[in-house]
């Protein structure tokens, strides 16, 4: 069995995923191919993975590295699973562009990696690279599974599912941590195992039902305590946006408050600057994290490539998916797939995040009941933008970029239609060769 890791320069994440594989008995003797276009980061990851293989896996795995476009097909050749963790354009210059150009128009963001104007342009510069990857896969590993971790998830997994021609699923961390994280924040005691039902779209999947092992419905207490937090006037809590979702829409969603603050037209308002403090919204949070991670990596990288590096299996889905397919031991995940009727009141071509059963037959998404009307409406605001962004990437027509931005709730609530067009033109120019030519 061969696993190819695209974007292996993401050393910490590569450690988590590949370390998980090495700690899975059925997968320990696999071939691991590391691919990146940055020679220094690739070498650091190679040193880390080989040390990890030696320390926790008795060198059972075979580890090789491949640098640059010229070696990409060799990295993919014969792969059974391809794990994608690339970031096109990195923090500098592209994340800086995503934040600084909109700021000139008075448009502020928190994360900008999934939805909003930042998510649109992150998708537009990434989809062409995914097309190169999957075109190569169809030639040298046509039966491989493509496990995508790169954001913006809904746009990328949506494109993969409709246009790539390879088996794929989009994977995020938010589903696994949603319920227990919420209960811990509200200090609600519960008995394991929890039974939950989550469905929606990536970063806006809805916790529709939650019961503890005794069959107790936990939502009444969740709603009560979330509203108590909001009414207390506290401003240093990190989940006030999602608690407002509970109060106003009745349900909690999977991704963090800093993400969801920029997914709608409620919270980041030039006209109401006091909302930033009221909801503890961290503007420019993602650039701040990037700078901190770059700084920390310089201090910590020796710990990762040092001989003593070790690992404990994480909750990342990748190793569990591979194990379930290889061993036919079923496993349930929250996966991002094309809707095709899975959630009846969302568009057929939308990328939805639903429960999926994984076994030797592959990744099989499970049909859901219709979402509550208000939740489907919230999801559709995002889906409209995501579908138009994919259409822009496929057709290379600039009008679809404009239309996606015009329909984005946050962008359109702050800027005029003419400003949105000018902003898109400025972002296209600033991205330069990171984008294909649009007409």
Q: Model features per residue range: what roles?
A:
Residues 187-439:
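Long, compositionally biased stretches enriched for glycine and/or charged residues
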Residues 23-60:
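Glycine-rich phosphate-binding loop and adjoining beta1-alpha1-beta2 segment
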Residues 54-80, 87-90, 109-119, 123, ...:
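A structured beta-alpha segment of the ubiquitous adenosine-cofactor-binding alpha/beta core
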Residues 5-29:
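N-terminal Rossmann-like dinucleotide-binding module
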Residues 81-103:
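Short, solvent-exposed beta-strand-terminating loops
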Residues 4, 31-33, 167-187, 194-197:
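Catalytic or ion-translocation cores adjacent to nucleophile or general acid/base/metal-coordination motifs
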Residues 23-26, 50-54, 139, 158-168, ...:
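Short, surface-exposed basic-aromatic patches at helix termini and helix-loop junctions that form
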Residues 104-162, 167-175, 179:
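Rossmann-like NAD(P)(H) cofactor-binding subdomain of soluble oxidoreductases
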């Amino acid at each position: 069995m061969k696993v190819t890791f695209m974007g292996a320069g993401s050393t910490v994440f590569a450690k988590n995923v590949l370390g998980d594989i090495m700690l899975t008995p059925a997968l320990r003797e696999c071939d691991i191919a590391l691919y990146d276009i940055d020679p220094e980061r690739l070498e650091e990851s190679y040193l880390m993975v080989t040390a990890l293989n030696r320390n926790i896996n008795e060198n059972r795995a075979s580890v090789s590295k491949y640098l640059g476009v010229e070696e990409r097909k060799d990295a993919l050749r014969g792969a059974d699973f391809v794990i994608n963790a690339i970031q096109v354009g990195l923090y500098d210059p592209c994340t800086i562009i995503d934040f600084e150009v909109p700021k000139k128009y008075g448009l502020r963001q928190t994360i900008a990696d999934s939805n909003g104007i930042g998510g649109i342009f992150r998708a537009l510069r990434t989809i062409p690279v995914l097309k190169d990857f999957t075109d190569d896969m169809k030639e040298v590993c046509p039966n491989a599974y493509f496990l995508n971790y790169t954001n913006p998830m809904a746009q990328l997994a949506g494109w993969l599912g409709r246009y790539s021609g390879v088996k794929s699923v989009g994977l995020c961390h938010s589903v696994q941590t949603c319920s227990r994280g919420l209960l811990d924040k509200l200090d609600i005691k519960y008995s394991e195992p929890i039974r939950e039902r989550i469905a929606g779209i990536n970063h806006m999947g809805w916790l529709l039902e939650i019961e503890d092992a005794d069959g107790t419905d936990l939502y009444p207490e969740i709603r009560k305590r979330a509203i108590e937090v909001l009414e207390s006037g506290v401003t240093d809590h990190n989940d006030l946006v999602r608690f407002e979702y509970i109060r106003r829409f009745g349900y909690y969603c999977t991704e963090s408050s800093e993400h969801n603050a920029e997914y709608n037209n409620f919270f980041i308002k030039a006209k109401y600057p006091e909302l930033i403090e009221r909801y503890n919204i961290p503007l420019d949070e993602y650039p701040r994290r990037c700078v901190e991670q770059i700084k920390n990596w310089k201090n910590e990288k020796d710990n990762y490539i040092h001989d003593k590096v070790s690992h404990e299996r994480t909750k990342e889905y990748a190793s569990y998916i591979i194990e379930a397919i290889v061993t036919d031991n079923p496993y349930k995940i929250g996966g991002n797939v094309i809707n095709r009727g899975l959630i009846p009141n969302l568009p057929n071509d939308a990328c939805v995040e639903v429960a999926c059963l994984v076994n030797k037959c592959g990744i099989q998404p499970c049909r859901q009941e219709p979402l509550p009307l208000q939740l489907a409406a919230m999801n559709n605001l995002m889906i409209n933008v995501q579908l138009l962004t994919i259409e822009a990437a496929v057709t290379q027509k600039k009008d679809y970029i404009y239309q996606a931005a015009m329909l984005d709730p946050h962008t359109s609530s702050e800027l005029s239609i003419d400003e949105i067009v000018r902003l898109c033109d400025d972002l296209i120019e600033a991205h330069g060769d990171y984008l294909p030519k649009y007409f």
